[in-house]
């Protein structure tokens, strides 16, 4: 959520910043919001004037009654004033609802460094690591490798739950678990994150706090009693501090959270339908930070590096792209995508998004910090990034480490978790 004062003060600047934002967003609602805000402020001034008049009349009535004089006229006037105040309060409440409706649907303001562009084709590559492997045999896609080795069972996953669900079996399940443990151990022991195992269901307030609702409700799995299955651990971990005031000396908070994630993938029909890249249920280790505003962009660079280092240790080629304005999404002010090389696709595929939301989520979730005990609370900056998506990492390992005989070498970093050098 944006700062209303900023919108009120610089509506044209806001509209310019949100032009070509890539969201289905009508910038004319900024003018509507400013108009509603002006109307609200006028009504509040009127209420204060009426309350002042009522207090004055109350004093006059007390004097009249004390002297035995008739106060009926003033009493009638006071009743009318009270009725008028109730009417204006009701009008203000209605305006508040309209403003809240608009505010929750305004996307974040892009950071000045975000490149112009309308789609992912205009994202800017900023660095590459490693060289894509050149095979001297006909390589296979990870879904074929997984099926042939008995690691993945897409057919029975579909039978049990439907399309885009998968059984991991035997060494496939062990590989998935090994990747999770490797991610967590690296982020906790080497990068200094605190491990979190969060709830897999959250309430509507939590989904609204991180920006999934109301805009992306169709992408969420809703269950009974107002709960939602989490699309990412970002939601419960960020909302851990909802409606709290943090201490400046405790910042930055750094959390690494493993969870299953659940997404309906509405609107993605026909995209990456085979394999592990786009599933309704998948595992992920999420990195979440809470930082002081002046430190948040340094923390974003560190977070992105932490995610990259995972792939460097696994020795899997990847690149980092800066996301352009039109592909930025709803909540981020600045976003990097880390894309891993997938031979079967012949291209780099997203395996992590690392974002700084500035105070956008903190305003929605009311997360503040205090620089010292007497200081006015300020909104924190929130950041997160995948560290990494587990299924996509497994897919990248199967494809990049495959052998001509159909077996798969185990990356050095995972051997202690799996207890094997080769999966065959």
UniProtKB/Swiss-Prot annotation:
Binding site for ATP: 263-265, 350-353
Binding site for L-serine: 232-234, 286, 386
GO cellular component: cytoplasm
Pathway: Aminoacyl-tRNA biosynthesis; selenocysteinyl-tRNA(Sec) biosynthesis; L-seryl-tRNA(Sec) from L-serine and tRNA(Sec): step 1/1
Entry keywords, A to Z: Aminoacyl-tRNA synthetase, ATP-binding, Cytoplasm, Ligase, Nucleotide-binding, Protein biosynthesis
Domain of life: Bacteria
Quaternary structure and partners: Homodimer. The tRNA molecule binds across the dimer.
PANTHER family reported in the protein's UniProt record: SERINE--TRNA LIGASE, SERYL-TRNA SYNTHETASE
Protein function: Catalyzes the attachment of serine to tRNA(Ser). Is also able to aminoacylate tRNA(Sec) with serine, to form the misacylated tRNA L-seryl-tRNA(Sec), which will be further converted into selenocysteinyl-tRNA(Sec).
Family to which this protein belongs: Belongs to the class-II aminoacyl-tRNA synthetase family. Type-1 seryl-tRNA synthetase subfamily.
Protein name: Serine--tRNA ligase 1
Organism whose genome encodes this protein: Clostridium acetobutylicum (strain ATCC 824 / DSM 792 / JCM 1419 / IAM 19013 / LMG 5710 / NBRC 13948 / NRRL B-527 / VKM B-1787 / 2291 / W)
UniProt lineage: Bacteria, Bacillati, Bacillota, Clostridia, Eubacteriales
Gene: serS1
